[in-house]
A protein has these predicted regions:
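Aromatic-lined carbohydrate-recognition surfaces of secreted/lumenal glycan-active proteins
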Residues: 110, 114-131, 187, 195-216
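Aromatic-lined carbohydrate-binding/catalytic grooves of carbohydrate-active enzymes
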Residues: 60, 64-178
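Structural recognition of the beta-strand scaffold that forms the well-ordered cores
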Residues: 38-44, 73-79, 115-120, 150-155, ...
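Glycan-recognition surfaces
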Residues: 139, 199-298
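Catalytic cores of secreted or luminal carbohydrate-active enzymes
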Residues: 281-329
Length: 408
């Protein structure tokens, strides 16, 4: 906000004074302060779906602490769709009977040193057919702030029919360019409206756009106040869905940075539809992508393998690196690289072949931007590999990955 003010001395002094007395102004520009690194936590949708209730969320918070996930960096406990009840005569939203006291639940989550997230839609109905925020944006933002909400996922859902623009992604259909532009502008305004509503509560709230990437959201979401935005349709708990989504992020790296992140959807690790190697691929790829790490499994029932994948601190450190640079593909055989602070680089070498013999894949160090030998550490084997001269050849398991940290 202060950056917008003229740089004259009096303006600078006024800004400094304003920030001392109203520190929330510092976060109010959706600056990097709200999510300086990609948000980490848990979301109810992938495992619990429409059945999620108060007890499930409390159990998730308990497990986040007991398992060590909180200490590994997972902080947000996010309720997805289906918590919404009816509005009262004044238009205030209430939770449904699955969530008897939302404020008490938020207090419980906070008492564990965690943060509390919630879900709504700019449309009249959410994707699950529950009450959305359409026409009640400020009122809902005020309610969330009163409950102690720290994170809002805002899901387009029924707002698509308000936009009357189903064909935004299908230009071949007979829709005029003007109509497309109008629909896009309406969507942007709807997202910005909630952004302004959240700001005026003066509570820092991470703002997550969920509209499946429509209209190249990564190009305009930061301007509309988004801290993260879904880039694709919903993920499923299988290798095909996860790898299609993950590897299709190539090219979006220039849109991410501290405070504004591409979101290829939540983690499926621990949900049972993939092998441990394939889940290691999701964890590694999401870390290379500087993607939000929102676990989507039942945290109260994790086996040792699931814990070891979700809580690999060396991989988490790649995701959470303070430079906030999203990695990119550096070689056709799915070799990806993410620059890290201090000049180090994370490199992930993926084997995407599931139904044939695994083949050796060679990383050329110069493709990762190194000239001369490098130190190498294997982040899944947790072991130093010594010095690499000019290349490194490995055979990652089918659907699996070898992930390295390289430095000179
Ligand atoms: C959409 C979103 C999902 C989930 C559901 C809930 O499909 O993309 O992540 O929030 O809605 O209804």
């Amino acid at each position: 906000m202060c950056a917008l003010v003229s740089l004259r001395r009096t303006a600078i002094v006024l800004c400094a004074v304003a920030l001392i007395f109203f520190p929330w102004l510092a976060v109010s520009a959706q600056s990097a302060n709200v999510s300086p690194t990609p948000p980490m936590g848990w979301n109810s949708w992938n495992h619990f779906g429409e059945k999620v209730n108060d007890a499930d969320v409390r159990a998730a918070a308990d497990a986040m602490v007991a398992s060590g996930m909180r200490d590994a960096g997972y902080i947000y406990v996010n309720i997805d769709d289906t918590w919404e009840g009816k509005r009262d005569a004044q238009g205030n939203i209430h939770a449904n009977s699955k969530f008897p006291d939302m404020k008490a639940l938020a207090d419980y989550v906070h008492s564990k040193g965690l943060k509390f997230g919630i879900y709504s839609s700019p449309g009249p109905k959410t994707c699950g057919g529950y009450e959305g925020s359409y026409g009640h944006e400020q009122q809902d933002a005020n309610t969330y702030a009163k409950w102690g909400v720290d994170y809002l996922k805002y899901d387009l859902c029924s707002y698509e029919s308000i936009m009357d623009m189903w064909d935004l992604n299908h230009p071949s259909k007979p829709v005029t360019v003007m109509r497309q532009q109008k629909a896009l502008a309406m969507m942007q305004q709807a997202y910005e409206k909630m952004h302004r509503s959240l700001l005026s509560t003066h509570r820092p709230i991470v703002y997550s756009f969920c509209q499946y990437g429509i209209g190249s959201v990564w190009k305009w979401a930061p301007e509309m106040g988004g801290n993260l935005w879904r880039t694709t349709d919903d993920i499923r708990d299988n290798y095909r869905s996860m790898s299609l989504i993950g590897f299709s992020q190539a090219g979006l790296e220039k849109y991410a940075g501290p405070g504004h992140w591409n979101d290829p959807d939540m983690l499926e690790i621990g949900n049972g539809g993939m092998t441990p190697d394939q889940y290691r691929t999701q964890m590694s790829l999401w870390a290379i992508l500087a993607a939000p790490l929102l676990a989507g499994n039942d945290l109260s029932k994790m086996d040792a393998t699931t814990k070891s994948i979700l809580m690999n601190k060396e991989v988490i450190a790649v995701d959470q690196d303070k430079l906030g640079i999203q990695g990119k593909r550096i070689a056709p055989l799915q070799i990806w690289m993410k620059p890290l602070s201090g000049g180090a680089k994370a490199v992930a070498i993926f084997n995407t072949i599931l139904d044939d013999q695994a083949i050796p894949i060679t990383l050329q160090l110069e493709d990762a931007g190194f000239t001369g030998p490098v130190h190498a550490r294997d982040l899944w084997a947790h072991k130093d590999l010594g010095i690499l001269q000019s290349s490194y050849t490995v055979v990652p398991p089918p659907g699996g990955v070898v992930m390295l940290r390289l430095w000179q």
